[in-house]
Amino acid sequence: MHPAHLLVLLAVCVSLLGASDIPPLPLNLVQFGKMIECAIRNRRPALDFMNYGCYCGKGGSGTPVDDLDRCCQVHDECYAEAEKHGCYPSLTTYTWECRQVGPYCNSKTQCEVFVCACDFAAAKCFAQEDYNPAHSNINTGERCK
């Protein structure tokens, strides 16, 4: 093999090793995103909800900016309740399917059922509320006290 080819191969291997340090999203969050898209019938990507209002996304505080943000607050509270029962919501995967009428949970274990129910309720709530682009990526430090 030509030395230049070896250098290119080495560079690719090193960059792949570096990329392996990037943590993936917990599988449950991927499932939750798919469940949201099922419930809202793909009207918008689930990622649009990641930084919405005071509660949609990581953490949450203050008063929800609207009813959609309130869906996220209730979801956070549901996850907190699951943790009190010994579950790890962000790591718990569950079995569900997207049916004609929307998401349907068919998990078996207590934690899977609990977490799926939290995600199901939030996804259905998202489907019933309006998305206001003005509430996306707000300054939570100022707005969510």
UniProtKB/Swiss-Prot annotation:
Residues 1-27 form the signal peptide. GO terms for cellular component: extracellular region. Disulfide bonds join C38-C98, C54-C144, C56-C72, C71-C125, C78-C118, C87-C111, C105-C116. This is Neutral phospholipase A2 homolog taipoxin beta chain 1. It is found in: Secreted. The keyword Disulfide bond applies. Expressed by the venom gland. Belongs to the phospholipase A2 family. Group I subfamily. D49 sub-subfamily. Coiled coil: none annotated. Its main location: secreted. GO terms for molecular function: calcium ion binding; calcium-dependent phospholipase A2 activity; phospholipid binding. InterPro entries: PLipase_A2 (IPR001211), PLipase_A2_Asp_AS (IPR033112), PLipase_A2_dom (IPR016090), PLipase_A2_dom_sf (IPR036444), PLipase_A2_His_AS (IPR033113). Heterotrimer: Snake venom phospholipase A2 (PLA2) heterotrimer that acts as a potent presynaptic neurotoxin by blocking synaptic transmission and synaptic vesicle recycling. May act by binding in a calcium-dependent fashion to neurotonal pentraxin-1 (NPTX1) and neurotonal pentraxin-2 (NPTX2), but not to neuronal pentraxin receptor (NPTXR). Also binds to taipoxin-associated calcium binding protein 49 (RCN2), a protein localized in the lumen of endoplasmic reticulum. Monomer (beta chain): Snake venom phospholipase A2 homolog that is neither toxic nor enzymatically active. Does not bind calcium. Gene3D superfamilies: Phospholipase A2 domain (1.20.90.10). GO terms for biological process: arachidonate secretion; lipid catabolic process; phospholipid metabolic process. Pfam families: Phospholip_A2_1. Keywords: Disulfide bond, Secreted, Signal. Heterotrimer of alpha, beta, and gamma chains; non-covalently linked.
